Amino acid sequence: MADKLTHLKQLEAESIHIIREVAAEFDNPVMLYSIGKDSAVMLHLARKAFFPGKLPFPVMHVDTQWKFQEMYRFRDKMVAEMGLELITHVNPDGVAQGINPFTHGSAKHTDIMKTEGLKQALDKYGFDAAFGGARRDEEKSRAKERVYSFRDSKHRWDPKNQRPELWNVYNGKVKKGESIRVFPLSNWTELDIWQYIYLEQIPIVPLYFAAEREVIEKNGTLIMIDDDRILEHLSAEEKARIQKKMVRFRTLGCYPLTGAVESTAATLPDIIQEMLLTRTSERQGRVIDHDGAGSMEEKKRQGYF
């Protein structure tokens, strides 16, 4: 009698099926690579889906120029080791305007450097499908998003104009200029992600592991001192409050907009144990999620991931 699939193997099989469906159904797909743990799992699944061949689509990083330095080093290392075709896009208009999260705030920085940057890249290369690592358990607007998330010709998401998804049947029909955002990890939880990383020994950015790091508390959020740019925007009193703490990150984004959590979880088993006990969302440290009520849904309506 054949062994029953474990919970993680079922999730793995579902995700691989979705990835293969997209590769077969669309003319020009791309995998968005944000360098975080979910991207690491999604990339691992994609490589499994087409092993021993190479990925039949490129990976793309929409770079805000404000990621953690360790993230950039990790990205370059993975691309070299895996032989990936990497596209990196930075919004030139944002660079020309000197957009940054300190002077312009999280909402404007995210809109110009992430949302507009993504739309520029999708238009430039003519991608008709884009894989993303979002999960339904992360945030309420993502909880109601389809696996195949339809976007109009301006990349906008209308939650009231989405297609039914029955069982594992997905409708990828689009007109010229329209596209689909595809979320193969929709049914995974944060705990599933960590258990899978542990079982498959997937490399991840070291920032996920607890270590002594320099941080400053701003509005209740622990912000890591990642490079000298942040010091230009701190007062003398704030600089005096910089201290070293044992912290790690549950989610990774632009470093001035991503809060660390105090933790001693320095190994994968430690992190899994911590996940079994925690009762807070991993996105509690994302400053952009607190821009206003329904801020994530509004960002997605404008074309955000």
Curated annotation (Swiss-Prot):
GO biological process, one term: sulfate assimilation
Associated pathway: Sulfur metabolism; hydrogen sulfide biosynthesis; sulfite from sulfate: step 1/3
GO MF terms held by the record: ATP binding; sulfate adenylyltransferase (ATP) activity
Pfam families: PAPS_reduct
InterPro entries cross-referenced by the UniProt entry: PAPS_reduct_dom, Rossmann-like_a/b/a_fold, SO4_adenylTrfase_ssu, Sulfate_adenylyltrnsfr_sub2
Enzyme class: transferase
This protein's UniProt keywords: ATP-binding, Nucleotide-binding, Nucleotidyltransferase, Transferase
Reactions performed catalytically: sulfate + ATP + H(+) = adenosine 5'-phosphosulfate + diphosphate
Gene3D superfamilies in alphabetical order: HUPs
EC number annotated for this UniProt entry: 2.7.7.4
Cleavable signal peptide: none
Function comment: With CysN forms the ATP sulfurylase (ATPS) that catalyzes the adenylation of sulfate producing adenosine 5'-phosphosulfate (APS) and diphosphate, the first enzymatic step in sulfur assimilation pathway. APS synthesis involves the formation of a high-energy phosphoric-sulfuric acid anhydride bond driven by GTP hydrolysis by CysN coupled to ATP hydrolysis by CysD.
Family named by the database record: Belongs to the PAPS reductase family. CysD subfamily.
Subunit-structure text: Heterodimer composed of CysD, the smaller subunit, and CysN.
Annotated protein name in UniProt: Sulfate adenylyltransferase subunit 2
Source organism (scientific name): Azotobacter vinelandii (strain DJ / ATCC BAA-1303)
Gene: cysD
